[in-house]
Amino acid sequence: MTEPLILQPAKPADACVIWLHGLGADRYDFLPVAEALQETLLSTRFVLPQAPTRPVTINGGYEMPSWYDIKAMSPARSISLEELETSAKTVTDLIETQQRTGIDTSRIFLAGFSQGGAVVFHTAFKKWEGPLGGVIALSTYAPTFDNDLQLSASQQRIPTLCLHGQYDEVVQNAMGRSAYEHLKGRGVTVTWQEYPMGHEVLPQEIHDIGAWLAERLR
């Protein structure tokens, strides 16, 4: 497996953001974003993992970086749950690696765009047991959230920021909103923010993420 990019901060690291890219992208996709955020988050390490390359059914079996296979797009995503679980294990391993460097998990954040965000949702609220600094979910959905979703006390305490485009044609706004509602209904401190955009990232969005992180790392 390709090793993640690791961006060391200007000061000794006392916090970490693990940031997952989307379908067909790679570990370099959010490198400029991480570099921009580190200009103000001076003691925050960024870890940018790389999804394995695998055939993706909705793209005619074409091989590309993908955290899991997507078998159908509508009305809801049909995915490989086995591959999602494997990717979630990759993320929990990264959390534990950062923990071994001396960073408390209450200062470790999981962020993900699109498919990467779906892995982050599953990891934080279905797999990881323990504190986390927070979750940042960009233009994404939660394929394993349903009405039977049950959260532990520590999972309920994970602050979450959901950001989505009003005109997203890839992951419809309603899909992101559904994940937000699932968490809100279970007592999670979750924030929903919309932007006049499609399936993309805007400078204002990155500014808002930086402010949200800074507030939690004071």
Swiss-Prot record:
Its EC number is 3.1.1.1. It comes from Pseudomonas fluorescens. Belongs to the AB hydrolase superfamily. AB hydrolase 2 family. Pfam families: Abhydrolase_2. Gene3D superfamilies: alpha/beta hydrolase (3.40.50.1820). It catalyses: a carboxylic ester + H2O = an alcohol + a carboxylate + H(+). The active site is at S114, D168, H199. The keyword Hydrolase applies. This is Carboxylesterase 1. One of its GO terms (molecular function) is carboxylesterase activity. Keywords: Hydrolase, Serine esterase. The gene is estA.
